[in-house]
Every structure is written in structure tokens, then in C-alpha cells.
Amino acid sequence: MSNQRTAPIPIDQARSQLLASIDMISTTEIVSLDDACGRIAAENITSLIDLPRTYNAAVDGYGVDSAELAAAPHKLFKIIGVARAGHPFDGVIGVGEAIEIYTGAVMPSAHDSVAMKADCSRTGDTVVIKAKLSKARNMRQPGENLDKREIIITK
């Protein structure tokens, strides 16, 4: 590399020279995601799914029906099962029943909120929820992180 300086040129001339030295892309090809790194997308790529896909727990705690808790604050709930990320609870949940639920676990349809463990008092297979819970409290909604049809790669 030479240490010699060239005389400055006008910006328009520099832009023209730069654009003239660039090869325009005139064709496209389909490649696997593994081979796409460092390439330019020919079109916007959109998500085909919502993430998360379902309602899921945002915290570790106990899944309950918020209306049932509101009707009887500090109610004693019977813990009838556990839901973990990748291992949903698939039993039937009745009145006065709760499940222990971990962050990322799919919410059962009978429950609409999660009480954080810090707001609960557990003894054996029962739990008292000491906090007031609104509907959808401590839950992630489908599409909260990534909405279906959202552009994930721009052209």
C-alpha cells in the first residue's frame, strides 16, 4: 500500500466511481439457512408462527383461575399436578385446584394467571395465594416475542 495521497474529488464523482465498481446482483437463488450467512435476502422473510405459540408461564409459581381467587382471597387451593416447559399438565382441573407451573410451561385452559411462588404459602399439596391476580398475570401471550407474519429478515 502506498503512502501517497491522491487529490480529493467531489462527492458526486466519488459516488459515481463507487457505483460503477459494484457488480449489480441480477439473479437469485434459494439456499438453506445454514448457507445463508453473509448473503443478501432477495425478499423479506416473515415468521410462519407466533412465539411463543401458546399462552405460557412467565414465572415459576402456581396456575390458578383469577376469578376464583378474586371471589375468595387467600383461598386454599389443592395442588393436583405440575407443568414444566416441554411437559404440559394434561389432567382435568376443577374448582379449588391449582397446578405448580414453571417458566415457559404451557398454561392449562382452566387457568388464566400465575401466582409467583414468593406470593404463596405452600404446605404439602396445598397452597394459599396471598396476592391479588388479574387475568393473564405473569403469563406470556401467543406472539408476544414474535408475531406470525412479522418480518424477521429484511431484504
Q: Where in the sequence are the language-model features?
A:
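Short, glycine/charged-enriched hinge/interface segments at domain edges or termini
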Residues: 2-6, 12, 62-155
